[in-house]
């Protein structure tokens, strides 16, 4: 066991994400906290001192800011502490992730699930703070990707598609939702390979096909870098290798 997860706030859909300002569609509500701020501060200190990485569930911009403040106070970059989801980040806090060595662990597919209604929750002035992947990457951060299954599909290719298009499977919206924050295909692939390995202290064993690394990899029927993004969800896994052994083979 490398780390522990602490829940700070709720979800955006239920208006439970902890915000700096009230919800645009619920002016008396700024969300909620599941774990008390002082309890989180104590737990982070205890777990980091014991050698554990801490991942804090934060969706709203206030939750993210407070978590960053706590990590700054603890000052434990070597722990590679993470913020899980990091969906809504105030513009003033973008650079702090890299500066503090805090890893934003994000799930691209959440963006394309939430984009239909999130403008109602946040309003036009805050909407550009939603899933700011490219802003984080340009500041120096890495973004390990995931699916948050069973909340979303565990298929990593759907996550890659969401990351580089910010569209749903029907191609909506044209041009992508907040397209300036899309990842490149190379960034999206790194997100589910080498960056994820780094985020779990396994970058010397996983995340690359390279001499000395474990032979854990997949073989696809197409090159993700050479096909149109709209075709990525159609790509099939032909083989899955674990420690050099075929554990899955697609039926011909």
Regions found by a protein language model. Give the residues of each.
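His/Asp/Glu-enriched, well-ordered alpha-helical/loop segment
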Residues: 44-55, 62-81, 85-86, 91-98, ...
């Amino acid at each position: 066991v490398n780390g522990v997860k602490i829940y700070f706030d709720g979800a955006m859909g239920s208006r439970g994400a902890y915000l700096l300002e009230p919800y645009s569609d619920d002016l008396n509500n700024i969300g909620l906290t599941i774990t008390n701020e002082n309890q989180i501060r104590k737990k982070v200190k205890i777990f980091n001192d014991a050698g554990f990485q801490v991942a804090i569930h934060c969706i709203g911009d206030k939750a993210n800011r407070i978590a960053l403040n706590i990590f700054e106070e603890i000052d434990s970059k070597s722990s590679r502490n993470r913020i899980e989801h990091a969906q809504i980040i105030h513009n003033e806090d973008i650079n702090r992730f890299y500066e503090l060595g805090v890893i934003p662990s994000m799930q691209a597919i959440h963006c394309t699930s939430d984009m239909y209604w999130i403008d109602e929750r946040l309003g036009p002035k805050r909407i550009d703070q939603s899933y700011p992947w490219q802003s984080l990457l340009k500041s120096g951060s890495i973004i390990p990707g995931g699916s948050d299954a069973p909340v979303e599909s565990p298929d990593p290719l759907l996550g890659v598609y969401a990351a580089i298009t910010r569209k749903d499977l029907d191609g909506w919206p044209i041009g992508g939702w907040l397209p300036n924050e899309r990842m490149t295909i190379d960034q999206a692939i790194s997100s589910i390979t080498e960056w994820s390995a780094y985020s779990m202290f396994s970058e010397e064993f996983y995340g690359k096909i390279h001499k000395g690394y474990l032979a854990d990899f997949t073989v696809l029927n197409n090159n993700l870098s050479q096909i149109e993004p709209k075709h990525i969800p159609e790509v099939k896994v032909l083989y899955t290798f674990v420690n050099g052994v075929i554990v899955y083979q697609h039926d011909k």
